[in-house]
Amino acid sequence: MLTGAVLSPATPLLHPAVTGRAAVVPELRAACARAVTQLLTGEPDTVVVIGPAAATGQWNPFGRLDPSVFAPGLPATGHRSLPPALGLGALLLDQAGYAGRRRLQAVGHDEPVSACVRLGRRLSETGTRSALLVMGDGSARRTLKAPGYLDERASAFDAEVERAVRAGDLGALQWLDQRLAHDLMATGRPAWQVLSGAWPGQGNDAEVLYCDAPFGVGYLVAYLRPSAASTPHR
């Protein structure tokens, strides 16, 4: 049973070692913290962090992110780092004080839609109360100063994701075009499509806490939970 899901960007701006004590986009960090806190009110047995990486696979649930992956000048831990998206998800759980079971699930950047959906279905069939923390960015081509420069298609792509999430229609994320997402540098695509496989139904209650494109990259923070009508009595 899925108790809830959070969508969060996987931006280095969430890591204090990158931005220092003063958050560069404080409202983004605040939205992520609030979303994760809401996720944990569902009392999941396990939180599954899903994020894009070089290849699909599970990572050590006790692993940590080495900040030096973002910039060589940052202090290195000396240990093998988690992929950035998973490491940032783990950091959000740590900051929320979560000490329960966690699973860190990477999904390859180039995984086809069908494989992402199958993985999501497997994650939803554990027989336990699970919550999903889904890490990934929207398009990185929203403005002239964006990492990938301006692509006129970027805003419409991010708006399509936002519409599906606001409507609680996570199954619609299956229809995101993989090639277009690649062209737009939308790294969240495979993780979102894992979510669509895990939780394909409509009518979920959704709350979008942040949706903007600072520095030309689309960031979406949202919390979703089963609607009251679809939640079984415990």
Where is each model-derived feature located?
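A short aromatic-anchored loop/beta-hairpin motif
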Residues: 1-81, 86
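Structural motif
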Residues: 3-6, 46-48, 103-104, 130-133, ...
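Short, hydrophobic/amphipathic alpha-helical packing segments
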Residues: 28-37, 89, 116-120, 192
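Active-site beta-strand/loop microenvironment that shapes enzyme catalytic pockets
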Residues: 110-159
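Polyanion-binding loop/helix "lid" in catalytic or ligand-binding cores
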Residues: 165-211
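Long, Lys/Arg- and hydrophobic-enriched amphipathic alpha-helices
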Residues: 199-234
